[in-house]
């Protein structure tokens, strides 16, 4: 492993409003040589902080292997790689597979969290998810899609906890 190369950065782009990207995420984009983002999910306006010299790839049509190869090749050249995900990359961000592939190649990486849509929604609606003597627990879940939801995590089972959902 080349120690002087910067780590690959997994950056949360926030919930869609370009002004809700974190300062740390914005700074990461500002020094990026390669940005790989999901064009179907991340608005192009979030890329406004990326230097004109940066290479920008839309991952919508790319396989996991292609994404990892692009990240590896750029990292081996000493470039700053940013993998831009919606919201917070650690929540439904599908970064586990990418991190595992980078670890196999001994490529360091760092995760820069982002604002998740759940909390942006609470702010927009002016609501609080936890209230004294009402609920001190928040459960985040999603509907089944390409990835199924385990039966033990059905809405009925989760609602039995009487927590905020």
Regions found by a protein language model. Give the residues of each.
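Beta-strand/loop-alpha-helix module characteristic of Rossmann-like adenine-cofactor folds
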Residues: 2-8, 76, 81, 109, ...
């Amino acid at each position: 492993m080349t120690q002087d190369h910067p780590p690959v950065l997994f950056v949360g782009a926030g919930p869609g409003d370009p002004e809700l990207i974190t300062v740390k995420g914005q700074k990461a984009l500002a020094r990026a040589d390669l940005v790989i983002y999901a064009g179907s999910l991340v608005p192009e306006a979030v890329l406004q902080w990326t230097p004109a010299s940066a290479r920008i790839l839309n991952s919508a049509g790319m396989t996991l292997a292609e994404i990892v190869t692009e990240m590896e090749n750029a990292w081996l050249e000493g470039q700053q790689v940013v993998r831009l995900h919606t919201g917070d990359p650690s929540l439904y961000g599908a970064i586990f597979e990418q991190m595992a592939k980078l670890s196999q190649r001994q490529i360091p990486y760092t995760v820069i969290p982002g604002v998740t849509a759940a909390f942006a929604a609470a702010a927009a609606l002016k609501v609080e998810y936890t209230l004294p003597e009402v609920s001190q627990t928040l459960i985040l879940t999603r509907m089944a899609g390409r990835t199924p939801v385990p039966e033990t995590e059905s809405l009925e089972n989760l609602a039995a906890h009487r927590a905020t959902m």
